[in-house]
Amino acid sequence: MAQTLLNDTFLRALLREPTDYTPIWLMRQAGRYLPEYNATRARAGSFLGLAKQPDYATEVTLQPLERFPLDAAILFSDILTIPDAMGLGLDFAAGEGPKFAHPVRTEADVAKLAVPDIGATLGYVTDAVREIRRALTDGEGRQRVPLIGFSGSPWTLACYMVEGGGSDDFRTVKSMAYARPDLMHRILDVNAQAVAAYLNAQIEAGAQAVMIFDTWGGALADGAYQRFSLDYVRRVLAQLKREHDGARVPAIAFTKGGGLWLEELAATGVDAVGLDWTVNLGRARERVAGRVALQGNLDPTILFAPPEAIRAEARAVLDSYGNHPGHVFNLGHGISQFTPPEHVAELVDEVHRHSRAIRSGAGS
């Protein structure tokens, strides 16, 4: 049965086509701020239990869509699935975040790295993509909203792989980058091949857009960013399938703290660049000059403010971008676990309401 996408506003915005309103989705929209997510996680037994069981991953992916009229779903997974598939032993200790049992620190460690067999080691992710697509689609083949697949960037994955987990200063991975750039580039080369294969597998399974999260690119100095992060994002994009089932599959790249390098990110071959809240969206639109769409960029902590303040800040973001195609509203980073869900409802409503007013000429 041929499928019909009932709401393709998000995909059209990524391709800089005119839309009736500005689409919105939120990084970490399926997460701990939702009571129903916490209930499902308790049933699954752990975070990895959620991520590695397609039925649970599907359930939590759809939860925010049941609450809010969001314009896209994003696969529930984790950016560290690739290094886990490489055999580094991922674990999430309570209250401590991700940890790897076998960090990559030595020449021997690097020599053991290989691109994982995606089907054999990450089939649970592609199974989840297929199951989510089915769950988004009714009996007549009508799909509610598009599904986004994603991966961490080669550099961001390397940060966790070398540090063995999160870090305040990334001194271990940055020391390797400067002292042994040959080792760093070998890690990044394997990671880039793996990320491209992983995203292509998600596209083949049904992801209708993909996003590369370069969460720690902004930890690098200018110059080092280009060598160790941007160049490898470019390599991933060059290997991506950009069409599937006769439709364009847009790609988004997001470097947290990457506003300085906006023009360079826009020249990588992406369809859209994600922005954090430190960037003026109107000036960013002028800087990219219509070459790419922009995604962002409300400060997530604004969602702790009173509803009218949330609405005012949402209007400010929309007004900054103006009545132009090519904007997807999002936060500048992931939503906090402490965010009141009712405040998210206020945000989504205001983005839809005010962007329609802007299109009609009634907004500022």
Curated annotation (Swiss-Prot):
<feature type="binding site">
    <location>
        <position position="160"/>
    </location>
    <ligand>
        <name>substrate</name>
    </ligand>
</feature>
<keyword id="KW-0456">Lyase</keyword>
<feature type="site" description="Transition state stabilizer">
    <location>
        <position position="78"/>
    </location>
</feature>
<dbReference type="GO" id="GO:0019353">
    <property type="term" value="P:protoporphyrinogen IX biosynthetic process from glutamate"/>
</dbReference>
<feature type="binding site">
    <location>
        <begin position="28"/>
        <end position="32"/>
    </location>
    <ligand>
        <name>substrate</name>
    </ligand>
</feature>
<dbReference type="GO" id="GO:0005829">
    <property type="term" value="C:cytosol"/>
</dbReference>
<feature type="binding site">
    <location>
        <position position="78"/>
    </location>
    <ligand>
        <name>substrate</name>
    </ligand>
</feature>
<dbReference type="InterPro" id="IPR000257">
    <property type="entry name" value="Uroporphyrinogen_deCOase"/>
</dbReference>
<protein>
    <recommendedName>
        <fullName>Uroporphyrinogen decarboxylase</fullName>
        <ecNumber>4.1.1.37</ecNumber>
    </recommendedName>
</protein>
<comment type="subunit">
    <text>Homodimer.</text>
</comment>
<dbReference type="InterPro" id="IPR038071">
    <property type="entry name" value="UROD/MetE-like_sf"/>
</dbReference>
<dbReference type="Pfam" id="PF01208">
    <property type="entry name" value="URO-D"/>
</dbReference>
<keyword id="KW-0210">Decarboxylase</keyword>
<comment type="function">
    <text>Catalyzes the decarboxylation of four acetate groups of uroporphyrinogen-III to yield coproporphyrinogen-III.</text>
</comment>
<comment type="similarity">
    <text>Belongs to the uroporphyrinogen decarboxylase family.</text>
</comment>
<dbReference type="GO" id="GO:0004853">
    <property type="term" value="F:uroporphyrinogen decarboxylase activity"/>
</dbReference>
<feature type="binding site">
    <location>
        <position position="333"/>
    </location>
    <ligand>
        <name>substrate</name>
    </ligand>
</feature>
<keyword id="KW-0963">Cytoplasm</keyword>
<dbReference type="InterPro" id="IPR006361">
    <property type="entry name" value="Uroporphyrinogen_deCO2ase_HemE"/>
</dbReference>
<comment type="pathway">
    <text>Porphyrin-containing compound metabolism; protoporphyrin-IX biosynthesis; coproporphyrinogen-III from 5-aminolevulinate: step 4/4.</text>
</comment>
<feature type="binding site">
    <location>
        <position position="215"/>
    </location>
    <ligand>
        <name>substrate</name>
    </ligand>
</feature>
<keyword id="KW-0627">Porphyrin biosynthesis</keyword>
